[in-house]
Amino acid sequence: MKKKMMSLAGLFAAGLMLFSCSSEVKEASYQIIPIPQEIVLGQGGAFTLANGTKVMYPEGNEKMQKNAQFLADYVKELTGNTLQVVAGTEGKGILLQVTPNEAQPEGYQLKVSADKVVINGGSEAGVFYGIQTLRKSIPAGQ
């Protein structure tokens, strides 16, 4: 499998502060395989994952809808928070998108800011791998 391209702006801070409702901070696992080619820590606040957070995907893309539902189901199981899976790409929340990249179809970028998480993959499979990395950043037991 080819190495994954990603830029993880603020991911570590997001992982530690992902759930603002918790009084106890749990550590996230960052044992990501394959090892990212690049990690960039950015400035700014952490993204807060809460009930009603939107998981957005491009309208009409069934594979991306399945990716979005997979993420929402995982978060529900782990945290009890119910995420909204919606077609569209505008607004705050988690945005899943594809920018075709024949050279690295399984590559992805993961960018985290205070109001949005963007997973941009070279294909739907790349987005899926980005979701796996995001899952690793959610502290266990939240």
Give the positions of each predicted feature.
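Bacterial N-terminal signal peptides that target proteins for export
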Residues: 1-9
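Repetitive helical segments and hydrophobic/amphipathic motifs
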Residues: 12-13
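C-terminal motif of bacterial Sec signal peptides marking the signal peptidase cleavage site
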Residues: 18-20
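Contiguous, structured surface segment used for ligand recognition
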Residues: 22-142
